[in-house]
């Protein structure tokens, strides 16, 4: 089973994506901070890391800088960025962060799962970027995900 590390501070987004990937047979570890992500990577092998672009690290860096750090420290691992801010392939290339692709939020889970499958099975040197228009929402293939999204939104409102 392939292990995916998901680094996202938004609990609802992380829960939705992690659940969809687990249903498809991936082992998913969720980290809320760059520090937690580094600890996971030190402890076990990870095939792919997905980092929220808006992540803020302890030193004030963002998801791009964490992606650069991970690409240098773990060259065999693929790194993807995710965000509700849309980035073009050209913007990602200019950022020179070494990522293999970009997953826009909100997630089209069917597309994301297929893309992750492609990236996990591709050699690390495969640098074809994927950058799609923001997804159309929750895939009917994952009906339990809508429940997660609703429950998470309710929890957020109560805080």
What kind of feature is each model-predicted range?
Residues 107-117, 124, 128:
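C-terminal output helix
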Residues 122-159:
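CheY-like receiver
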Residues 66, 94-102:
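As written
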Residues 39, 61-76:
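Short amphipathic alpha-helix used as the core "switch/output" element in two-component signaling
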Residues 52-54:
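Active-site residues of response regulator receiver
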Residues 5, 30-48:
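Acidic, metal-coordinating helix/loop segments flanking the phosphotransfer/catalytic sites
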Residues 11-29:
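Two-component/phosphorelay signaling modules centered on CheY-like receiver
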């Amino acid at each position: 089973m392939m292990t995916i590390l998901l680094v996202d501070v938004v609990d609802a987004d992380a829960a939705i994506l992690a659940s969809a990937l687990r249903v498809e047979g991936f082992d998913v570890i969720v980290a809320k901070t760059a520090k937690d992500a580094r600890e996971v990577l030190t402890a076990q092998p990870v095939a792919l890391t997905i980092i929220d672009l808006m992540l803020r690290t302890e030193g004030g860096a963002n998801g791009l800088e964490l992606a650069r750090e991970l690409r240098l420290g773990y060259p065999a691992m693929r790194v993807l960025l995710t965000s509700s801010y849309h980035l073009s392939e050209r913007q990602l290339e200019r950022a020179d962060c070494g990522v293999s692709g970009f997953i826009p939020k909100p997630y089209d889970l069917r597309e994301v799962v297929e893309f992750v499958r492609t990236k996990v099975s591709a050699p690390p040197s495969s640098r074809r970027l994927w950058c799609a228009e923001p997804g159309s929402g929750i895939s009917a293939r994952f009906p339990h995900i809508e429940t997660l999204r609703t429950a998470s939104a309710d929890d957020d409102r109560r805080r």
